[in-house]
Amino acid sequence: MPAMVGFLLTAVGLPLLTLVAVARGSAGQGSSGWTAMTRYLPTWAATALAIAIYIIMGPAFATPRTGLVAYEMGLKPWLGEAGQHGLLLYSLCFFALVILVSLDRGRLLDAVGKYLTPALMVMLLILALGVIIAPQGGMPEASGDYIDTPLIKGMLEGYNTMDTLASLMFGALIIGLLQRKGIEDYPSQFKYLTIAGLISAVGLSAVYISLFYLGNSAAGVVTNVDNGGAIVNAYVLSLFGHYGQLILAAIITLACFTSAVGLLCASADYFHGLAGWTYRKWVLLMGCVSILVANVGLSQLISLSIPVLVAIYPVAIALVLVTFVQSYFGRPRMAFRAVLLVVFLFGCLDGLGAAGMQMKAFAFLPLFDKGLAWLLPTLLTCGLGMLLRPREALAAEAA
């Protein structure tokens, strides 16, 4: 239970707060969500952070992972021992279609998303009810950090969803879309983003809780697997047979496909606006890179992404935090930059530790062994920022 709570905090709670923060940061600024949220940062720092997020959500991790999840849950179960050899061919076909749709965005993507989302939710509801009514196995034995620090372990595992980074990326895009549609006032923008966040939070919570329950009743159903997709596949096969497994494969494949198109389009749009290349060239480049990255395999990609996410996620969390409390800073520009600098430095230490580097010199830091060395210094810096007095007040006292 503590692990599930920790996971939901970072995989559901933080994305919801992030969407609200994007709307709050845009209040009265007359600019897009990202520009408004990072207005106290140097332009180069805000741009570097945006580039890092779009690369992570684009060709480096999130987009290739959609193809890998589709492969693991959509095709590999039907290939048996030949599954590993089919990854290259599958990724070529999958991302070729993603590139084609991304090059010509239109009604196709809207139609697929419109009908796919309800179908996916119905399928997940059926799976959740099946797991509750007819669990297929027993509860597996907890091990490692799931015994010692389950709450923190759950929080760190929630990083892997990348949902907070996605909320920063798509929240800013939604603000821009609302502004283009003539919705300029803050109350309306706040309302729409909050409603969207609440709907997604409820849906994600239902999905994650049902998957937690599935994992807690999977002992004996499957053995010797190295990722969650294989567990879900084996469970569905045991619960519904090959027909249910086929339906799950089709829906997951389509869901991953539309996610890949959305991520690729958003990333290409951003870099098109940032650099001189055309949108189509960016789509082709990022699609090809996604093919290469996807062929490392799902488990390996997740392992490679963990140190990066451990380093960058605290920065995103701190950005959301200071967006809510910046009105309490006596010198908002100074405090804002100090908080982000501190969290970046300590987040990098956590990331290096997660990568397996020897970091004994920093073992004295509170929560360093838990991957949360950034937490206390960030909160302390934020508190000090609230104690700073405005220049005007100091000048008045001096006079």
Regions found by a protein language model. Name each.
Residues L9, G13, L17, A119-V131, ...:
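Selective recognition of specific alpha-helical transmembrane segments in multi-pass small-molecule
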Residues A27, F95-L116, R180-I183, L292-L304, ...:
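Membrane-water interface regions at transmembrane-helix termini and the short interhelical loops
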Residues S32-R39, V207-F257, G273, P307-L309:
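TM-loop-TM module centered on a large, flexible mid-protein loop between adjacent transmembrane helices
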Residues W44-G80, C256-H272:
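Hydrophobic transmembrane alpha-helices that form the core helical bundles
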Residues P59, M121-Y146, T164-L165, Y213-G215, ...:
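Hydrophobic alpha-helical segments and their helix-loop junctions in multi-pass secondary transporters
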Residues V101-V131, I306-I317, A338-V343:
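Membrane-interface loop-to-helix entry segments
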Residues G130-G137, D145-L211, I247-C256, L341-G351, ...:
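Hydrophobic, membrane-embedded alpha-helices of multi-pass small-molecule transporters
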Residues V320-G383, L394-A399:
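C-terminal membrane-solvent junction of multi-pass transporters and transport-like membrane proteins
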